[in-house]
Amino acid sequence: MSKVLFVFGTRPEAIKMAPLVIEFKNNPAIEVKVCVTGQHREMLDQVLDFFEIEPDYDLNIMKQKQSLGSITCSILTRLDEILASFMPAHIFVHGDTTTTFAASLAAFYQNIKVWHIEAGLRTWNMNSPFPEEGNRQLTSKLAFFHAAPTLQAKDNLLRESVKEKNIIVTGNTVIDALLIGIKKITGSTGDVREIISLKNKLNLDKKIILVTLHRRENQGELLRTICDDIKQLALEHDDIEIVFPVHMSPRIREVVNEKLSGVVNIKLVEPLAYPGFIWLMNNAHFILSDSGGVQEEAPSLQKPVLVARDTTERPEVIENGAAMLVDPRIPNNIYSSCKKLLSDERLYEKMSQAGNPFGDGKASKKILDYFVSLEDIK
């Protein structure tokens, strides 16, 4: 029996790994264990509960004002013991977090094969996003197998001399998770209390604009500028309702609350659990976000995305027209881009009908099928 360890620590990782964990656990020939680092404690636990995944190991590493170096050291030290005890033949990591890189390095040191899910995303700028671009490039150097979500991601890996035989194009597992999630909330098997609360708070006769912001490069004075644009849009359009789940980071919460509290058609809410968030995405007119996951999910729901960044490691969604880059460093760019999408029906229709370049919801099965087909795993 082949031993496999899944390691993740943040809410986005958990969402994207959940369908893969479920798929692997349904195969009796594979012994599956799950290790969470707790890099995003509360938001991570919500996702685990929703997908009914109980971790076998919980490193619970998070402390107040912890540096990236401290997080990395904690994961390396704690995971070293788990790998020595469980002795998996393969470790699965996802994306570009500090957990991703640290877990890959720990596995590399014990000669354990690293499987990198959502591999090959690149901006080619180590400072944007930081530290994610560095994390994913370093992880690619340590990985044995690369599950690239798109052909573009595969090409990026080939440019870095990754062997083609070690790459498979699978689509993105976030679409698998989204389809599971929509089915759960539609069938009322998920936690619907949050959805009921949202319905009571919002005026669904208005156009709902969902806003999410969390990246380091959008904090500080730039976040103040973005909030000014959002406020101006809200004050000029009484036919819209802006819903902003505010990230737990004190640096974000302080600015957002100062700038946007008290505006009647701006609803500042606590971070949403996964079922509430996908319900809100599904009911939004469009989305303003710096989130990578939102860029991947929203096209499946036919929701245009304005990406509040100057670049993206997901160029496919820009190229196919489902999303648009809106550089927040350009004065009034957020405001004018939102205003245009509200008024230009042809643009809205084109973006909402562009389709999803990130797959069909079968990525997890493709990864499992490839895994069991390898000679040394049977």
UniProtKB/Swiss-Prot annotation:
UniProt pathway: Bacterial outer membrane biogenesis; LPS O-antigen biosynthesis
EC supergroup of this enzyme: isomerase
Family label: Belongs to the UDP-N-acetylglucosamine 2-epimerase family.
Enzyme nomenclature, EC number: 5.1.3.14
Keyword terms, alphabetized: Isomerase, Lipopolysaccharide biosynthesis, Plasmid
Reaction(s) the record says it catalyses: UDP-N-acetyl-alpha-D-glucosamine = UDP-N-acetyl-alpha-D-mannosamine
Encoding gene (name): rfbC
PANTHER family to which the protein is assigned, alphabetical: UDP-N-ACETYLGLUCOSAMINE 2-EPIMERASE (PTHR43174:SF2)
The protein's name in its UniProt record: UDP-N-acetylglucosamine 2-epimerase
One Pfam family matching this protein: Epimerase_2
Residues annotated as catalytic: 214
